[in-house]
């Protein structure tokens, strides 16, 4: 009898400890913008990563009386004891605040057309609940689309109609055994991948065409070189290595020469080295004097990546410090032109907008350059200060899922994958080299990598890769840039290299 009582007591203590260890995290998301630039938000109470997730969705037709009911449910749930909290809860109480006409699955260019439809479709997909409780009424094909094709490439999610019985604490308490949705299973499958697996999956798709020697396909070719596919890449580069000429007529071709820098580093090929030095020599006039900045910068922050790493790699390949000197000269020039008071970079002087890749380029470009810089170079610490200052300015703008956004400091602009990969690579190199504090940046890196995996399918489909973007005249123009949902060479190269960095290769 005593043994039985002791066993019961131990069981009760262990359960108390287990319940005490459960704590709620209250979250809020700026999930997107309406066509009128009004914010669409979600709120959540999250307990355990692996607990079932229920999403309540109201207001597809516009303002809804059920919004108050759902907000009250959320508040009650946030104040409940841990023993009552069996599921993660997300509420989108006012999904369509401007009463736009919706269409599911969405058509048109995201997010300038059918804005709200695209926002909801992609955001709900990347958060993959196990059950959606949907307000009754016109759903614009949402339920049918989920059943017939699944959501945003993740798969199906069961739907229940909102009712008095499923907006209670009792309903939430008894949902702890809710089955995994197909969408959640796909999300888990994506996040379970190792960095090497992601890199290899992308290397099977991207990096097979260098007929135009520009950086967009070039980044995937660099990734494939890093993964060891040297013979295959040799075949791609052979026309240039045996004398086929090309003109470096723009910054994209200039940055494409990074392929030859990586090829020279790995293979020692002298022709590749010569192509790198030939491109880097564009920094100097006919008297071998440095220009104020590298040509073809077009006053855009892209140039931190398009030119600076090439100069640093030329310095390593040649052993000539003038390339390092020019790298810092160019960086200082661009920084003076484009740095904003908040530590972010405007994309160009034409619009004071902190565009996503317009900040990814400086972060990644300087990290790449610093990885090549001699520690004894007198300007190295200056460039390192530029990078650290920029990353410190970027860090507060990482969202709770791990992403940076199309306009870094504009709430509700879309979560953009290429810039997140580039900033992630800068942070990874900063941590590996001891430039950044582990406590601040390691969690940010892990969040970014997890978010990237969620938005990268097994067959190389990406969610929200900003299309090619030159100088834009206004904030509106940047907010309306196409967010690609599909295969994309630019995202393929950046995400592949991020995966390789995360794999430590």
Which residues does each predicted region cover?
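CBM-like carbohydrate-recognition segments
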Residues: 186-218, 225-226, 230-282, 286, ...
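Short glycine- and acidic-rich boundary segments immediately preceding or forming the N-terminal edge
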Residues: 19-41
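Active-site/substrate-binding loop(s) of hydrolase catalytic cores
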Residues: 30-35, 50-163
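Bacterial N-terminal signal peptides
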Residues: 7-17
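Extended ligand-binding clefts on enzyme/binding-domain cores
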Residues: 193, 301-302, 312-408, 413-424, ...
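Short beta-strand-to-loop junctions in surface cap/lid or active-site-entrance loops
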Residues: 41-50
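Extended ligand-binding groove/face enriched in aromatic
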Residues: 242-354, 459
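Positively charged n-region of N-terminal signal peptides that target proteins for export
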Residues: 1-5
């Amino acid at each position: 009898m005593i043994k039985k009582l002791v066993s019961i007591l131990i069981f009760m203590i262990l359960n108390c400890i287990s319940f005490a260890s459960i704590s709620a995290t209250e979250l809020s998301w700026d999930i997107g913008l309406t066509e009128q630039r009004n914010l669409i938000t979600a709120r959540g109470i999250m307990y355990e990563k692996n607990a079932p997730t229920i999403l309540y969705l109201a207001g597809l037709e516009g303002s809804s009386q059920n919004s108050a009911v759902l907000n009250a449910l959320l508040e009650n749930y946030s104040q409940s004891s841990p023993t009552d909290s069996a599921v993660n809860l997300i509420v989108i109480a006012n999904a369509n605040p401007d009463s736009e006409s919706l269409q599911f699955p969405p058509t048109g260019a995201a997010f300038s057309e059918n804005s709200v439809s695209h926002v909801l479709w992609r955001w709900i997909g990347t958060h993959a609940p196990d059950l959606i409780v949907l307000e009754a009424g016109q759903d614009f094909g949402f339920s049918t689309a989920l059943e017939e094709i699944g959501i945003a490439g993740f798969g199906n999610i069961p739907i229940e109609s909102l009712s008095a019985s499923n907006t209670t604490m009792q309903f939430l308490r008894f949902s702890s055994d809710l089955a995994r949705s197909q969408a959640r299973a796909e999300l888990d499958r994506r996040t379970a991948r190792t960095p090497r697996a992601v890199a290899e999956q992308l290397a099977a798709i991207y990096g097979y065409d260098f007929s135009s020697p520009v950086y967009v396909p070039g980044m995937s070719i660099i990734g494939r070189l890093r993964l060891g596919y040297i013979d295959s890449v040799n075949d791609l580069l052979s026309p240039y290595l045996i004398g086929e000429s090309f003109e470096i007529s723009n910054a994209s071709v200039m940055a494409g020469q990074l392929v030859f820098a990586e090829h020279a580093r790995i293979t020692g090929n002298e022709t590749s080295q010569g192509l790198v030095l030939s491109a880097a020599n564009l920094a100097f006039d006919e008297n071998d004097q440095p220009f104020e900045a590298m040509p073809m910068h077009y006053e855009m922050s892209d140039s931190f990546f398009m030119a600076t790493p090439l100069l640093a790699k030329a310095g390593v390949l040649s052993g000539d410090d003038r390339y390092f000197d020019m790298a810092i000269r160019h960086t200082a020039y661009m920084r003076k032109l484009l740095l904003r008071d908040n530590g972010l970079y405007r994309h160009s002087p034409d619009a004071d907008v902190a565009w996503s890749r317009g900040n990814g380029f400086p972060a990644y470009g300087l990290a790449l350059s610093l990885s090549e810089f001699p520690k004894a170079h007198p300007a190295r610490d200056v460039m390192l200060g530029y990078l650290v200052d920029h990353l410190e300015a970027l860090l507060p703008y990482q969202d709770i899922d791990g992403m940076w956004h199309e306009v870094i400091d504009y709430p509700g602009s879309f979560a953009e994958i290429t810039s997140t990969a580039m900033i992630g690579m800068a942070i990874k190199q900063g941590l590996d080299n001891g430039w950044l504090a582990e406590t601040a940046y390691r969690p940010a890196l892990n969040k970014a990598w997890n978010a990237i995996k969620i938005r990268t399918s097994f067959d190389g489909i990406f969610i929200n890769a900003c299309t090619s973007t030159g100088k834009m005249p206004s904030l509106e123009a940047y907010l309306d840039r196409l967010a690609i949902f599909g295969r994309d060479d630019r995202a393929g190269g950046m995400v592949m290299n991020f995966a390789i960095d995360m794999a430590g290769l």
